[in-house]
Amino acid sequence: PAVNYKELRGDNNKAESSAQIRERVIRAREVQLNRFAAAKERIYSNAQMGTGHIRTYCELGSDSERMLERAMQQQGLSARAHDRILKVARTIADLEGNPQVESKHIAEAIQYRTLDRTYWA
């Protein structure tokens, strides 16, 4: 998401500390472990999800579906890119403590994908 310049240059007391970020990551990892505990396969994180798991755990609302579809068409993304975007969006939602993958998570994941293709391809 876009960063407000004044917030960036202003008082940094609002910024998360490394310890807070660490706790958020630990909570997200616990959510993922619990999510996949009943899976037949040994899956420990969103990155390991296959297509079936993605369909189960990355349900999208109509706005999110449209956003992802538009990105796929405009950027000429593959099925593999589609799945990667959904895995990243699911992880972003987990880090936020949100059980639903929302449009903002899809948008952020698409931005990461675009950066990856632009600067590290």
Question: For the regions a protein language model found, what residue spans apply to each?
Answer:
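Basic, amphipathic alpha-helical bundle interface domains used for macromolecular binding and assembly
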Residues: 1-120
